[in-house]
C-alpha cells in the first residue's frame, strides 16, 4: 500500500472516503487496521483513530483500539462508551479456546488461558493499558485489556463503584486500579 494509494498501489476505494459506507472491501480494511495499530504504538492518537474509523468495522478489537485512542487524548467519556461496546462484542465465556491460541493445551497454558506467573506479575505492576489489541487475541486476554481500560476511564470520570467492581472482577491485582481505589478512599 502506498502512503496515498490503495492496497498494492491501486487507487483508493471510493468507500474509504466515508466511514458510514460500511466495512471496506478486501485487504484495504486490514491494511488500515494494521496502520492504526502502528500509529497507536507511536501514540499518534488522531492518525490511529482515523485509520480505525475508516475501516468501517464495528468489531471488538477495532472498538477497543478506538477507545484507546480516545483515552490517549483524555476523551474519557467516549473511551468508556467504546470500550463498553467492545466488551459486548466478545464471544461468550465457556466456548473452548481454539488450538494454537494462548491457553490451549499445546501452548502450555492453563485451562483458563492464564499467562505464566512472571508475565502476570509484570502486567499487574504496569500502569494503565497502552497496548493496542490485535485481531485474534484470545478472549480472556482481550477481556482483561478491556476491563483495565474501562476501569481507568471510569476512574477518571469519577465512577468509583464501577472501578471497585472491575477491580474485584480482575482479582484486585492491578496496581493502577488499586491506586485509584486508594485515592477514592481518602
Regions found by a protein language model. Give the residues of each.
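Flexible helix-coil transition and linker loops at the boundaries of alpha-helical arrays
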Residues: 20-22, 52, 91-140
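"A position-specific structural signal for the A-helix of alpha-solenoid helical repeats
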Residues: 27-30, 34, 65, 142-152, ...
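Boundary/linker segments of alpha-helical solenoid repeat arrays
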Residues: 60-65, 89-102, 172-185
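Alpha-helical segment of the N-proximal tetratricopeptide repeat
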Residues: 22-54, 149
